[in-house]
Amino acid sequence: MIDVLFLPEPVSQQHVCVVVDVLRATSTIVTALANGARCVVPVRKIAEAKKRKAENILICGERKGIKPKGFDLGNSPIEYFTVKDKEVILTTTNGTRAISMINSQKLYAACFLNLHAVIEQLRNHDHVTIVCSGQKGKIAYEDVLCAGAIVYELNDKLTDGARISRELWKQSRRKDLSKLLFESQHAQELAEYGFSSDITFCSQTDLYSIVPVFVEDRFIKQAP
């Protein structure tokens, strides 16, 4: 059975969950790990992130799209090409909040950048819940679209949420993904802040072949 939650809610189960925040937290997590970060530790609050500052630890994230004062990096995935051997502490408006609400047997991070790597990982599991992070408590088109792309490739029983997301992807999958993302409300807000290049970057499919898996309090690369 595959379920898709359009907005985050407390999830506690002995199955597999996938968190999706295309713009931009899970895209940033995937990019950081693909470029050699030791791990990505999601935290809820800015103060909590700052407490963890130390050598070889980067304090990263955003509030209202903007890097907080004193942080090393924002939430733009294109800032994470030079994080080899660093521990990344990440706090964001939507993605890390969604992550904090999930308690599951396994938790993976997905976006378009690692789409088929996640799909292949999920073929080994019978029960999957995909949690869309949304944007400020509202449904985010790009997250539901990505969830639908995952569901589309998996032959299993579907909840109504999974069926809706799959149908959205079926109607959209032959269209220009970058153009689709730019039309989303969240993308338009990011573009106003000057992050158009992030939207273009996050619309790439299968740029990376890694799957972040949550272990204890952090995301690491899933072992091959």
UniProtKB/Swiss-Prot annotation:
Top-level EC class as recorded in UniProt: hydrolase
Pfam families membership: 2-ph_phosp (PF04029)
EC number from the UniProt entry: 3.1.3.71
Keywords, sorted A to Z: Hydrolase, Magnesium
Catalytic activity of the protein: (2R)-O-phospho-3-sulfolactate + H2O = (2R)-3-sulfolactate + phosphate
Cofactor(s) demanded: Mg(2+)
Gene Ontology MF: a single term: sulfopyruvate decarboxylase activity
Protein name according to UniProt: Probable 2-phosphosulfolactate phosphatase
